[in-house]
C-alpha cells in the first residue's frame, strides 16, 4: 500500500474529513494530493499526520513507493469510469495502465490493474474473461497477504455473480468481502459501506427486504459521515428499492428521488437512468401506468444513448408491463419480445424470465392459453433455479389461475401450494 493510500484508508476508517486532517497548518488540497501520491511530505509533516491519525510514524515510513504517474492516472481514471458504468472506456484505461506497467512494478499496482480489468469485463458481460482476471487478482492479494485486497477481489466476484444473476453466489461473495475488510487494520469505512450496499441489494433481489434494509441501514451509518455523493446515491437508490418491496411506497419514492438528484449532480447518466427506471416501476406498481411509462421512456433514452443493452432490456420489460395495464397489447408484445431478445443476447436468465412472464400475461389476455402456459412454465423453471422465492410465488399464482381457466384444477392446486411454500420460504428467510 502506498503512502497516499495508507493515509486515505486510515482517515476514512476513522471518519475524519480531509479538512480536519489538514488542521490549521496544512491545506485541504495538500491532503488530497498527498492521498493520490502527488506530493512528497517532509518527515515533520508525516509525524504530524501520524499523530492526528493515531498511527505509529513507522507505519507511514514503510509504505510502498507509488507506481509511475502514468499508471496511477490511468488506474484512477478506470476506477472513476467504473463508478459511472462506462465500462468500455474503463477497459481502455486499464489496458493502457497495463501497457505502462514496468518490469518490477509494485504488486499492488499490478493487482489494481488486474481487478480493474476484471470489473470492466464484468460490466461488458464478458464473464469468462472477467473470471480469469479475478482469479489472477485473488492470487496477487493472497501473495501480498492483504485482507483489504482480498476483500476487493471478493467484492468484484460478488458483482460478477450479480451480473450473472447467481444471487446465492453473490450473497456468499459479499459476505466474504465484508468479513475480509473488517479484519483489515485500519478498516476502510467507505469500502465497507459499499460492500454492505451490494449485500443489501442482493438480499433485496432474493426477495428478503428485511435483511436488505438491515445491511443498507448499516451502510448508511458508515457512509453518511464521509459525504461521498456517489456512495450516498447508491445507498438511497437501494434503500428505495428495498422499501418499495416492503410496500412503504412514499418512503421508497423519497429515497429514489434523492438518488436521482445525487446521480444527476455527478452527471452519472447510467445510474440516473437506473433511478428513473425504478421510479417508473414504483408508479406502475401504484396503479399509475401512464405516469410510470413517462419515466421509463426517459430511462430508455439514456440507456440507448449509452448502448446499455441490459438497461434497455430491463426498461423494455417494465414498459411492456405498463402497456399491458393500459390495454395496449401490440405495444406490450413488441416491448416484451425485444426485452427477451436482448436478455438472451446478454445470457441473463433473470431478465429473460421476467420478460417471459410479461409475454405469458399478454398471451393469456389474448386467449392463447397454451402459449401462455409454456411461457409461465419456462419463467417458473428459471426463477426456481435462481432461488428467487418472491418471483416463484408470483409466477406460480399467475400460472395457477391460468390453469384454472383451462380446467386443470389439480395442477392449479399444486401451483398455488408452491406459491404458498415460496412465500413461506421468503418470510422464514427474513
Task: Show which residues each predicted segment covers.
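C-terminal non-catalytic interaction modules
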Residues: 1, 8, 12, 36, ...
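Short alpha-helical DNA-recognition segment
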Residues: 12-34, 95
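DNA major-groove recognition helix of helix-turn-helix/homeodomain DNA-binding modules
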Residues: 42-59
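TPR/Sel1-like alpha-solenoid repeat signature
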Residues: 74, 81, 93, 110-121, ...
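Amphipathic alpha-helical segments of tetratricopeptide repeats
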Residues: 95-102, 135-145, 175-186, 217-228, ...
Amino acid at each position: 500500500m502506498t503512502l497516499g493510500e495508507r493515509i486515505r484508508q486510515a482517515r476514512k476508517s476513522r471518519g475524519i474529513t480531509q479538512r480536519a486532517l489538514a488542521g490549521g497548518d496544512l491545506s485541504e488540497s495538500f491532503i488530497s494530493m498527498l492521498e493520490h501520491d502527488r506530493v512528497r511530505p517532509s518527515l515533520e509533516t508525516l509525524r504530524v499526520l501520524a499523530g492526528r491519525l493515531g498511527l505509529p510514524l513507522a507505519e507511514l515510513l514503510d509504505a510502498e513507493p507509488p507506481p509511475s504517474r502514468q499508471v496511477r492516472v490511468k488506474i484512477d481514471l478506470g476506477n472513476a469510469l467504473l463508478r459511472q458504468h462506462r465500462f468500455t472506456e474503463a477497459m481502455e484505461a486499464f489496458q493502457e495502465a497495463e501497457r505502462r506497467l514496468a518490469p518490477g512494478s509494485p504488486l499492488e499496482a499490478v493487482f489494481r490493474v488486474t481487478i480493474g480489468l476484471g470489473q470492466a469485463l464484468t460490466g461488458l458481460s464478458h464473464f469468462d474473461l472477467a473470471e480469469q482476471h479475478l482469479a489472477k487478482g485473488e492470487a496477487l492479494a493472497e501473495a501480498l497477504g492483504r485482507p483489504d485486497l482480498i476483500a476487493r477481489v471478493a467484492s468484484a466476484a460478488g458483482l460478477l455473480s450479480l451480473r450473472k444473476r447467481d444471487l446465492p453466489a453473490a450473497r456468499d461473495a459479499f459476505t466474504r468481502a465484508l468479513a475480509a475488510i473488517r479484519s483489515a487494520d485500519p478498516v476502510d469505512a467507505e469500502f465497507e459501506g459499499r460492500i454492505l450496499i451490494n449485500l443489501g441489494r442482493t438480499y433485496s433481489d432474493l426477495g428478503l427486504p428485511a435483511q436488505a434494509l438491515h445491511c443498507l441501514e448499516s451502510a448508511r451509518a458508515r457512509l453518511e459521515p464521509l459525504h461521498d455523493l456517489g456512495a450516498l446515491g447508491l445507498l438511497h437508490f437501494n434503500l428505495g428499492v428495498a422499501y418499495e418491496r416492503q410496500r412503504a411506497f412514499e418512503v421508497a419514492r423519497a429515497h429514489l428521488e434523492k438518488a436521482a438528484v445525487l446521480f444527476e449532480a455527478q452527471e452519472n447518466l447510467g445510474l440516473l437512468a437506473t433511478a428513473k427506471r425504478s421510479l417508473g416501476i414504483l408508479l406502475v406498481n401504484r396503479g399509475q401506468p401512464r405516469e410510470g411509462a413517462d419515466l421509463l421512456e426517459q430511462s430508455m433514452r439514456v440507456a440507448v444513448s449509452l448502448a446499455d443493452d441490459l438497461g434497455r432490456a430491463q426498461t423494455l420489460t417494465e414498459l411492456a408491463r405498463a402497456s399491458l395495464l393500459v390495454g395496449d397489447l401490440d405495444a406490450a408484445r413488441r416491448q416484451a419480445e425485444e426485452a427477451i431478445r436482448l436478455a438472451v443476447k446478454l445470457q441473463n436468465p433473470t431478465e429473460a424470465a421476467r420478460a417471459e412472464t410479461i409475454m405469458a400475461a399478454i398471451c393469456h389476455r389474448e386467449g392463447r392459453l397454451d402459449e401462455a402456459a409454456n411461457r409461465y412454465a419456462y419463467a417458473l423453471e428459471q426463477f426456481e433455479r435462481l432461488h428467487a422465492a418472491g418471483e416463484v410465488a408470483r409466477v406460480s399464482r399467475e400460472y395457477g389461475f391460468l390453469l384454472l381457466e383451462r380446467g386443470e384444477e389439480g395442477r392449479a392446486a399444486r401451483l398455488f401450494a408452491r406459491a404458498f411454500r415460496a412465500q413461506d420460504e421468503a418470510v422464514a428467510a427474513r
